[in-house]
């Protein structure tokens, strides 16, 4: 696959997702980093987004709840280049009915090469990165070339 460059803006579009057993962990992380997160555009799956808004008064673009299609909505935003960072505290010890959606979301984040945190330690590394508030170039698939090759 040919690659091209995408510039993540200084003001990031950040998706926040958490499974039920991890919501409190994400809430604590968000509250701890609220001054930094307020400088960015936030998205979240439905329940998580509403909980964050209620607890912090931050503006969060809430999708549907994860099991109702919210994970897929976030994945679509990633594939459209509208999400720059994914913070996804998923529960590795409990299966969820929408496991295929979870796998698809993580796959899309990997395909489009955006930073992903699946636990507090990694989320802390990302938000404390010297690049977090800077524009950063990343390599992504060159979809136009991909499509042109497929249509030959």
UniProtKB/Swiss-Prot annotation:
Q: Name one GO biological process term.
A: methylglyoxal biosynthetic process
Among InterPro entries, the record links this protein to: Methylgl_synth, Methylglyoxal_synth_AS, MGS-like_dom, MGS-like_dom_sf
Q: Which reaction does it catalyse?
A: dihydroxyacetone phosphate = methylglyoxal + phosphate
A molecular function (GO) term: methylglyoxal synthase activity
Which residues catalyse the reaction?
Answer: 71
UniProt entry keywords in alphabetical sequence: Lyase
- Which residue intervals define the domain MGS-like in the entry? 6-152
Q: Which SUPFAM superfamilies match?
A: Methylglyoxal synthase-like
- Stated EC number for the protein is 4.2.3.3
Q: Where does substrate bind?
A: 19, 23, 45-48, 65-66, 98
- Output the Gene3D superfamilies linked to this UniProt entry: Methylglyoxal synthase-like domain
Q: Which domain of life is it from?
A: Bacteria
Q: Name one GO cellular component term.
A: cytosol
NCBIfam families, alphabetically?
MGSA, PRK05234.1
Family, per entry: Belongs to the methylglyoxal synthase family.
Protein name (record): Methylglyoxal synthase
Q: What is the lineage of its organism?
A: Bacteria, Pseudomonadati, Pseudomonadota, Gammaproteobacteria, Enterobacterales
> Gene name on record?
mgsA
């Amino acid at each position: 696959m040919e690659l091209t460059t995408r510039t993540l803006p200084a003001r990031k579009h950040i998706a926040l997702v958490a499974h039920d057993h991890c919501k409190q962990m994400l809430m604590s992380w968000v509250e701890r980093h609220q001054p930094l997160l307020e400088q960015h555009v936030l998205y979240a799956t439905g329940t998580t987004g509403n909980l964050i808004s209620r607890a912090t008064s931050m503006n969060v673009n809430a999708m549907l709840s994860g099991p109702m299609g919210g994970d897929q909505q976030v994945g679509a935003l990633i594939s459209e280049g509208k999400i720059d960072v994914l913070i996804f505290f998923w529960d590795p010890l409990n299966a969820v009915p929408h496991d295929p959606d979870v796998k698809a979301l993580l796959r899309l984040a990997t395909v489009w090469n955006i930073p992903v945190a699946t636990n507090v330690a990694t989320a802390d590394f990302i938000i404390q990165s010297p690049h977090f508030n800077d524009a950063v170039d990343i390599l992504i698939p060159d979809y136009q070339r991909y499509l042109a090759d497929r249509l030959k």
